[in-house]
Regions:
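Acidic/histidine-rich, surface-exposed loop or edge segments in extracytoplasmic proteins
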Residues: 47-52, 185
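Boundary at the C-terminal end of the N-terminal hydrophobic targeting segment
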Residues: 20-30
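C-terminal cap of thioredoxin/glutaredoxin-like
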Residues: 5, 63, 130-214
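Bacterial N-terminal signal peptides
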Residues: 10-21
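A short beta-strand-turn-helix
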Residues: 28-44, 72
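Structural alpha/beta surface segment adjacent to cysteine/selenocysteine redox centers
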Residues: 42, 50-133, 138, 206-211
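Bacterial N-terminal signal peptides that target proteins for export
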Residues: 1-12
Length: 214
């Protein structure tokens, strides 16, 4: 189980600094497949736990993620990982997560992710299959993957992992060292909500400054 060292109040948000996370949580796991952006050797990893039906998650996608990509992810400083946190056990949120995973099985996870969070989106079984067609996916394989609800266990595993970090809503974020993970000197930072870019930048810059050789 995790140990929180302290709560830090900043001008923008309250943060929990986490010395050690759940034992089975890593910066990137084998089940992340194509749900990772950025360089493998980026010193920091930012994990998002999210639901495609969550309004605040969409706010992060539209307003904050593009700035993080330009400033930290594309420059090799941060690796970004998307993990699922469906807020219900069934329904459109779960179906959307399955659709994205099925697209990921054909190498188009981020294309589907962006479509699901995009303008004019519809979230229902028919729209997921239409999106798959427009993305050029193998329709037979996608339909079979979606109808069989493949990847469900991995999706709910992500949610259980988020709960063990202390999250019980979306979105939630964990910022941590990519290789070493949380340590006493450089604890992980739990960011509970869709805060503005400046809040993420403050924590990323602070953690980067603590790394060896910085």
């Amino acid at each position: 189980m995790r140990r929180a060292s302290l709560m830090r109040i900043t001008g923008l948000m309250s943060l929990v600094l986490v010395m050690a996370g759940p034992a089975d949580v890593s910066a990137v796991s084998a089940t992340d497949d194509g749900r990772v952006q950025g360089k493998a050797d980026a010193p920091l990893t930012l994990i998002e736990y999210s639901d495609f039906t969550c309004g605040y998650c969409m706010k992060f996608f539209k307003e904050t993620l593009p700035k993080l990509q330009a400033t930290y992810i594309e420059t090799g400083k941060v690796r970004f990982v998307y993990r699922d946190y469906p807020r219900a056990d069934r329904g459109v949120g779960v179906e959307a997560a399955v659709a994205a995973r099925c697209a990921g099985a054909q190498g188009r996870y981020w294309a589907m992710h962006d479509r699901l969070f995009g303008e004019g989106r519809r979230l229902d079984s028919g729209s997921f299959k239409s999106a798959a067609k427009s993305l050029g996916l193998d329709q037979t394989e996608f339909g079979k993957c979606f109808d069989e609800r493949r990847h469900l266990e991995s999706i709910f595993q992500d949610r259980r992992e988020a709960n063990r970090w202390g999250f019980h809503g979306t979105p939630g974020f964990i910022l941590m060292q990519t290789v070493a993970g949380p340590t006493e000197k450089v604890p992980a930072v739990a960011i509970p909500g869709a805060f503005p870019f400046e809040a993420f930048a403050e924590e990323i810059d602070r953690m980067l400054s603590k790394l060896p050789g910085s």
